[in-house]
Amino acid sequence: MFAQQQHDRRRFLGWAALSLAAVWVGTRESVQMITMKAFRPSGAGDLASFGRATAWLNSPPLTAADLRGKVVLVQFGTYTCINWLRTLPYVRAWATRYKERGLVLIGVHTPEFAFEEDVDNVRRAMKERGITFPIAIDNYRAIWNGFGNHYWPALYFIDASGRVRDHHFGEGHYEESELRIRELLAAAGRDGGIDAEAVSFEAHGPEAGADWSNLKSPETYVGHHKAENFASPGGAAVNTRHVYAVPPRLRLNQWALSGEWTQKSEAAVLNAAGGRIAFRFHARDLHLIMGPAARRRAVPFRVLIDGYPPNTGHGGDIDDHGNGTVTEQRLYQLIRQSGPVSDRQFEIEFLESGVEAFAFTFG
C-alpha cells in the first residue's frame, strides 16, 4: 500500500488541450473520465481528525472541534511536488482573501521522499514559499488515510458544519474551486462584501503554470525502485558502487548516468567527482529534485543543453553559463526555455561527489 501511495504523485501529468493537470492513473482510465472526476461533489462525511499529526507549523494543533463553524479548505501536498508548487499562488491568495470571512486553510504535508519527513526541511520550504497558514505534518500518513486520499495535490472543501462537500485532485479548475469556497462561505453567512472577481497574480519560477501543449516528458524517478527509461549500458547495479556510461544516443525520455554512482531505492548517490546525468526531454521547463548527501555540504554543478550552456534558457537555480550549487534537499529549476520547444539533450555534471538525485519533473 505504501509503495502504491508513493507512486501516486506521477498521476498528475499535463496533456494538451486540458486546463488542468490530467491524472495519469495505473488503471489507464481515459483523460476524459479523469477530467470529470477531478472536481465533483463529495459525500465523504465528516472532517477527518488531525489528532495524529506529527507536528504543526504556523499554528498550535487544530482539531475538528476547533474548526466547527468555520469553512475549511484542506490541501495535501509535499514540498518537492511540482504539481503542488504550481497550485500555491492560488492557495496563498485564497488564504489571504477569505481569512477574515471565516475560511481556514490547512495544508497537510504528507512526504514522498524520506528527506521530506524532516520537519526542519519542511519549515524552511514553507518559509521560502511564503506560506503562513497552518501546516499539519503527516509523516505517518494518518491524516492522508483518514481522508482516504491518494493524490498530491488534493483539495477538500469542508462546510461550517464540518462536512466534506467537495474535493479536487490535481492542478486546474481554480475559478471553480474559488467559487466553491464562496458558496460555502455564503451558506455560513460570511460572504458579504467579497469582490466578485477571481484572485489574480503573476506566478514565477516553478510556481508558474506549465506549458501543457509542449509537455511531452513525464516525471521520472532516478532511484532504482521506480526508475523507468534508464539507458546506461548494462542497466542498474542496485545498491552497489558502479561506474556508468551515457550511450552515444538517447531516445526521447531516456536518461543515463555517467561516472561512479550507487543507485539506491529513492535516489542515485554520486561517489566520485565528475559524475553526470543526461536526459533527452521535450518540455519548456526541467527540474531535478536533489540534495547533498551530508548536511552543510555544497556540491557545485554545471548544466549543458545540447552540449552548450543554456544562456537565456537557464532556470532560476543556475546562471546563464549553467553553473549552480546544490546546498539543500529540494526541487531545483534548471531549464526554463523562452523560445520554441523541441527535443533537447540535458546534461548535468557534478564537480564534486556527495550529491543525491531523486527525480526529474517538467513543465
Regions found by a protein language model. Give the residues of each.
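A short beta-strand-turn-helix
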Residues: 51-72
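Loop/turn elements at helix/coil->beta-strand transitions in domains of secreted/extracellular proteins
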Residues: 69-72, 101-104, 131-133, 160
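Aromatic-flanked redox-active Cys/Sec active sites in thiol-based oxidoreductases
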Residues: 75-81, 110
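Structural microenvironment flanking redox-active thiols in thiol-disulfide oxidoreductases
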Residues: 85-129, 139-143, 299-301
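Short, internal strand/loop/helix patches
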Residues: 120-158, 288
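Short, glycine-anchored, charge-dense loop/turn motifs used at functional sites
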Residues: 156-166
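Non-catalytic, surface beta->alpha helical segment in thiol-disulfide oxidoreductase systems
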Residues: 164-185
